[in-house]
Amino acid sequence: MKVLALSALLSLASAASISRRSDFCGQWDTATAGDFILYNDLWGEDNASSGSQCTGVDSASGNEIAWHTSWSWEGGSSDVKSYANAALQFTGTQLSSISSIPSTWKWTYSGSDIVADVAYDMFLGSTADASSDEYEIMVWLAALGGAGPISSTGSTIATPTINGVTWDLYTGPNGDTTVYSFVAQSTTEDFSGDLNDFFTYLVDNEGVSDSLYLTTLEAGTEPFTGSDAELKVSEYSVSIE
């Protein structure tokens, strides 16, 4: 899920190689690292009866980052508690102007009784800023412990194969935003592909207009419940071309 924040100019230092830092644990704590802002983003923590989460940078350089997040959450089993994520900093770009969005993502998850997703979260709107988002596009590399996406019916609307992976596609509303969720049929811990292929599919098959702007591109995890959990991202990269 996206939380709007004031954008900040990246300093020259942020483009340099960055090594491991201390973890941050506050609800809205962030760290700028390379081309990314890393968010702890405990937006749903009030849905938990107890729990906490901390996130940290392991290394970063340009459009590549390694990072981790550790958490334990109890209660509110049907509610997402957070979305720790690495958000690419870029100017909103019209889909028709994008030729490719190459991305790699290698990760592992450990812990007990984990219910969570590991997912890209992207937004499309009629303007280049994030004030007019109409669509949320999620690409779930994993649905752990029975986690499920937003869906009007609970049923898939298609099962496309994109970037060599077969996905269950769901759709449903989140307020005024239409959500499309591509959920990998098998957990994919080592992903390499072109995220633009998902937008091309939606333009060709679901009536999404290529005049819309990509305004947000994030990658992280949405936990529901679990204990002593850690998502470790050993390699993540993305760029818009």
From Swiss-Prot:
Entry-linked Gene3D superfamilies: 2.60.120.180
Catalytic class of the enzyme: hydrolase
GO molecular function, one term: cellulase activity
Glycosylation sites per record: 47
Keywords attached to this entry: Carbohydrate metabolism, Cell wall biogenesis/degradation, Glycoprotein, Glycosidase, Hydrolase, Polysaccharide degradation, Secreted, Signal
Compartment annotation: Secreted
BP-aspect Gene Ontology terms: cell wall organization; polysaccharide catabolic process
Pfam families: Glyco_hydro_12
EC number(s) from the headed UniProt entry: 3.2.1.151
Record-linked InterPro entries: ConA-like_dom_sf, GH11/12, GH12
Origin superkingdom: Eukaryota
Catalytic activity: xyloglucan + H2O = xyloglucan oligosaccharides
GO CC annotations, alphabetized: extracellular region
Signal peptide: 1-15
Main function: Catalyzes endohydrolysis of 1,4-beta-D-glucosidic linkages in xyloglucan with retention of the beta-configuration of the glycosyl residues. Specific for xyloglucan and does not hydrolyze other cell wall components.
PANTHER family xref list: BLR1656 PROTEIN (PTHR34002), XYLOGLUCAN-SPECIFIC ENDO-BETA-1,4-GLUCANASE A (PTHR34002:SF9)
Family classification: Belongs to the glycosyl hydrolase 12 (cellulase H) family.
Protein name: Probable xyloglucan-specific endo-beta-1,4-glucanase A
Encoding gene, per UniProt annotation: xgeA
